[in-house]
């Protein structure tokens, strides 16, 4: 009966009722260049449809099958940092490398540059998103563009410009990150001056916009996620901003210096990912923070900060965490600056906590 109960509970890891994060210490395994990783600075992480892990580093791409690494330089002339990885249904990876897009066909491991041309010039990509096998959105400093993806006679992708969305931008203002709504009808774009724009794809109209804060300096948008009716925006200077998808009811979570307790491990937030309907993980320059929906306050959030774990001390690295990936099967991957990648099996943490609760109840009885 215990195994049946545990199976049912583990099946709910992503449900609203149960968060897979717990206050007990979490064990991590570290993988570095000594294990075969191409570089110890890991900028992006992706698990493909075959179960293979792909790690984008500051000098190229690494493939990890659970036992061994295979490394790819991607270009014979340039040192390629891989900041984002997306995959289509044909097992083709699209990589944000420097300021352009590179593809990797996993079937034959052929790589090449996906030329995204606007007015016969290569698009200077600051962010991109693969909508489906045939449509890719990308933004540069001033515009958003959609490209049609097709395959050549060898089955490798190439692109053709479909539409350019122009915007009125202030002097020095530029786009940094964007995301798309679940129904694929609208896009949220974030600029370096902390402005958020809500764009309707079919008409190209800006439906709404909001200023997150007033600043004369760079906002430093690092990621934007639309999840469970909320929009999450992280900044490498100002922490995390949360609001409704209508751009209303703004909340700001930050590290309050010299104030205890604080709400964030560090204001330099490099990445945010959903863990469940009610929990978000933020990786920062100093550890990571879990954001948990507050059951007592509608629309409220509580945070749990991790800046030190027993296993981190034995791994001998600084907790500079800059990327993350959560596998729904229970594995958390965190990329670091200079410390390789950390891996933790969170489902076993859940089982151990469940067993402790059962023992506690028996003792109470």
Name the predicted role of every residue range:
Residues 1-365:
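Carboxylate-rich, polar loop motifs that coordinate divalent cations or form catalytic acidic clusters
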């Amino acid at each position: 009966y215990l195994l049946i109960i545990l199976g049912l509970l583990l099946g709910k890891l992503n449900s609203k009722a149960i968060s897979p994060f717990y206050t007990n210490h979490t064990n991590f395994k570290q993988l570095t260049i000594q294990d075969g990783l191409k570089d110890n600075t890991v900028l992006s992480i992706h698990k493909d449809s075959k179960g293979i892990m792909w790690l984008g580093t500051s000098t190229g791409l690494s493939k990890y099958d659970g036992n061994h690494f295979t490394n790819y330089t991607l270009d014979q002339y340039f040192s390629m940092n891989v900041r984002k990885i997306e995959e289509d249904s044909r097992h083709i990876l699209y990589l944000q490398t420097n300021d352009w897009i590179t593809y990797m066909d996993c079937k034959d491991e052929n790589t090449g540059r996906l030329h995204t041309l606007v007015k016969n010039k290569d698009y200077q990509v600051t962010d991109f998103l693969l909508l489906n096998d045939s449509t890719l959105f990308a933004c540069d400093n001033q515009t958003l563009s959609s490209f049609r993806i097709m395959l050549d006679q060898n089955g490798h992708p190439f692109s053709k410009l479909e539409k350019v969305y122009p915007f009125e931008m202030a002097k020095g203002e530029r786009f940094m990150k964007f995301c798309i709504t679940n129904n694929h009808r609208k896009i949220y774009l974030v600029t370096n001056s902390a402005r958020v724009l809500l764009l309707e794809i079919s008409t190209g109209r800006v439906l709404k916009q909001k200023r997150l804060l007033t600043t004369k300096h760079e906002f430093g948008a690092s990621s934007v996620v639309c999840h469970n009716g909320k929009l999450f925006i992280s900044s490498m200077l100002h922490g995390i901003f949360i609001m409704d998808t209508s751009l209303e009811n703004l909340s700001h979570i930050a590290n309050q210096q010299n104030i205890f307790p604080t709400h964030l491990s560090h204001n330099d937030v490099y990445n945010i990912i959903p863990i469940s309907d009610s929990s978000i993980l933020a990786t920062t320059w100093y550890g990571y923070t879990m954001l948990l929906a507050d059951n007592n306050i509608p629309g409220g959030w509580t945070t749990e900060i991790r800046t030190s774990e027993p296993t981190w001390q034995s791994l001998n690295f600084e907790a500079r965490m800059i990327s993350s990936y959560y596998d729904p099967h229970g594995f958390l991957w965190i990329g670091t600056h200079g410390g390789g990648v950390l891996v933790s099996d969170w489902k076993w943490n859940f089982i151990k906590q469940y067993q402790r609760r059962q023992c506690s109840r028996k003792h109470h009885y």
